[in-house]
């Protein structure tokens, strides 16, 4: 590689790094993810996303206007062949506090899940419960997970297609027991950016042999759908994500979310909402391919 190529590659990476740091910083600010004095438990699986999250959090920590701690935690689920030395060695090079939590959830998953069935659901529940308990043990105030924008959009479609629910992943949530706050600092980051970032940083990626190789997973088909959309219509994934941020309960059909039964009439004839809707429709570039031809039905 000549000097011109090297200079160009460095420039592109610097732009990528700034974009990712800006996206993480904006997500943290928008959802008040990290506050003064927080102890952030960064959950590191060994995948590209959690490595990138840790790296960006540590960089933001140096320049943040508030003081907070970052503690790296890995859950060793006792998968056969798992390289136990990689993460401790990596954390040592960073000179940061870390813990390796030993919990044989692998055997439980293999015992409970029939052959050929997806293991991700039970695996994630067991992992989540263990991490919640450990966070309390070390006094962590926030649990940081490495889910990104693509994960959030994929989850929404998974719930729509296979659960008949309009539900995704929130950037910040309180656990069911009310004792933990989970944050997703990569909420505004695209997976394709994280892939490039991880390649350049040469993180010691550890593949998940328990579930990552199951190509027939429902999530994989949805991921492929989004990748195809990205190629044909750049920006569509971002637009879908923005729609998750801009919900109009009265324009859906959930009777628990909006009181359709007792819908009051506006006797004053206020047409502001209707006029706004008309303005939006008239000023929006509508993708005509999304319409259905009903003339021959």
From Swiss-Prot:
- The answer to whether UniProt assigns keyword tRNA processing to this entry is yes
Q: Which Gene3D superfamilies did the record assign?
A: HUPs
What GO terms are given for molecular function? 4 iron, 4 sulfur cluster binding; ATP binding; magnesium ion binding; sulfurtransferase activity; tRNA binding
Keywords associated with the record: 4Fe-4S, ATP-binding, Cytoplasm, Iron, Iron-sulfur, Magnesium, Metal-binding, Nucleotide-binding, RNA-binding, Transferase, tRNA processing, tRNA-binding
Q: Where does this one sit in the cell?
A: Cytoplasm
Please list the reactions this protein catalyses.
cytidine(32) in tRNA + S-sulfanyl-L-cysteinyl-[cysteine desulfurase] + AH2 + ATP = 2-thiocytidine(32) in tRNA + L-cysteinyl-[cysteine desulfurase] + A + AMP + diphosphate + H(+)
Please give the InterPro entries that the UniProt record associates with this protein.
Rossmann-like_a/b/a_fold, TilS/TtcA_N, tRNA_Cyd_32_2_STrfase, tRNA_thiolation_TtcA_Ctu1
User: Which amino acids does the record list as binding [4Fe-4S] cluster?
Assistant: 120, 123, 211
**Gene Ontology BP term (one):** tRNA thio-modification
Q: Which SUPFAM superfamilies match?
A: Adenine nucleotide alpha hydrolases-like
Query: Which Pfam families does the annotation name?
Result: ATP_bind_3 (PF01171)
Enzyme Commission (EC) number: 2.8.1.-
Q: Which cofactor(s) does the record list?
A: Mg(2+); [4Fe-4S] cluster
Motif (PP-loop motif) positions are 45-50
Pathway(s) where this gene product acts: tRNA modification
Question: What CDD domains would the database entry show?
Answer: TtcA-like
Q: Would you tell me the Gene Ontology cellular component terms?
A: cytoplasm
Question: Member of which family?
Answer: Belongs to the TtcA family.
- What's the miscellaneous note? The thiolation reaction likely consists of two steps: a first activation step by ATP to form an adenylated intermediate of the target base of tRNA, and a second nucleophilic substitution step of the sulfur (S) atom supplied by the hydrosulfide attached to the Fe-S cluster.
Q: How does it assemble?
A: Homodimer.
Task: Quote the HAMAP family the UniProt record gives.
Answer: TtcA
Protein name listed in UniProt: tRNA-cytidine(32) 2-sulfurtransferase
């Amino acid at each position: 590689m000549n000097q011109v190529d090297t200079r160009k590659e460095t420039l592109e990476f610097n732009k990528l790094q700034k974009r990712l740091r800006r996206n993480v910083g904006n997500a943290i600010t928008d959802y008040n993810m990290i506050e003064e004095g927080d102890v952030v438990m960064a959950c590191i699986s060994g995948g590209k996303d959690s490595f990138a999250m840790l790296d960006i959090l540590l960089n933001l920590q140096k320049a943040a206007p508030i003081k907070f701690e970052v503690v790296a935690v890995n859950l060793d689920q006792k998968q056969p062949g798992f390289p136990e030395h990689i993460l401790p060695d990596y954390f040592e090079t960073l000179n940061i506090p870390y813990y390796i939590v030993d919990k044989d959830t692998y055997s439980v998953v293999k015992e409970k899940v029939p052959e050929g069935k997806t293991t991700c659901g039970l695996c994630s529940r067991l992992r989540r419960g263990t991490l919640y308990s450990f966070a309390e043990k070390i006094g962590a105030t926030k649990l940081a997970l490495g889910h990104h924008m693509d994960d959030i959009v994929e989850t929404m479609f998974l719930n729509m297609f296979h659960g008949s629910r309009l539900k995704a992943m929130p950037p910040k949530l309180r656990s069911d027991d009310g004792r933990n706050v989970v944050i997703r600092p990569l909420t505004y980051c695209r997976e394709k950016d994280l892939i490039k970032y991880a390649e350049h940083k040469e993180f010691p990626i550890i593949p998940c042999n328990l579930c990552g190789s199951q190509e027939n997973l429902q999530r994989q088909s949805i991921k492929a759908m989004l990748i195809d959309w990205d190629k044909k219509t750049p920006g569509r994934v971002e637009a879908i994500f923005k729609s998750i941020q801009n919900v109009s309960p009265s324009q859906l059909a959930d009777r628990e979310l909006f009181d359709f039964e007792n819908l009051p009439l506006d006797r004053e004839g206020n047409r502001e909402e209707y006029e706004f809707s008309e303005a939006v429709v008239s000023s929006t570039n509508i993708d005509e391919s999304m319409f259905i031809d009903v003339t021959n039905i």
